[in-house]
Amino acid sequence: TLSLHDALPISAFFTAVSALSTCGISIVNATTHWTAFGQVVLLVSVQMGGLGVMTFASLIALAANHHMKATQRLLTANELGTTKLNEIRGVLTVVITTTFIIESVTFLALFPGLYGINRGNVRHTAREALFFAVMSYNNAGFTPDGAGLHVNNWAVGMPIMASAFCGTLGFPVLLNLMRCARHRTPPRRWSLHTKITLVTTFSLVLLSLAWFLLVEWDNPFLFKGADVETRLRYGVVAAVMPRSSGFDLSWVPHIYSNIPIQPD
């Protein structure tokens, strides 16, 4: 049972705004502070924020009335990155399907690694896998426990990073890539938005990785006795995670002061 102090409205309000905006900043421990119902609300809020307000509102309108007003169609088309109003229903379907496919694949990929970490506790493993799957793809930094990201476990860290990276690209880019793959469109004919997003994203990740490894390779506080694989693993996490996903990197205080790592 939560005490009166623990249930302060400011904590609930702050967490709600953080979840809906998918910024992932939490002033309380999401696992110990909130009840099971509260954690479900947190997951749903992040999912709504990840899909987008207009996307979610359009889904409700379609479910209730099977049609949308012209203004709502224009706003939804703008959010989804399409210029054809008659494509909105199909694009919405693709967006929802893509979201749940990626999150389901992430959940299944995370389960074996988390199962080993949790020593065979299926219920706890399923809860953590679901939490990480939703949070990573929607680029929210909430974690299901106080330990933060399992950066030392590739079986857990890699699916989270891959899902977060896909979520970072955004629906318009993912939709364009899927269409190009279906029609076997060569990269030179991809949309300008897709090209700019991919080039910029990969450039930032590669530059961040190179800079982190260059500066931190001999850091005794972070890599004392570590092998090359461990150094690369930390470097990849440091390059991918802070850009958008917002997951806590508990080892950040050990890096050198001239290489700050902060989320966008």
Q: Model-flagged regions — what are they?
A:
Residues 1-264:
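Membrane-proximal intracellular helices of multi-pass ion channels
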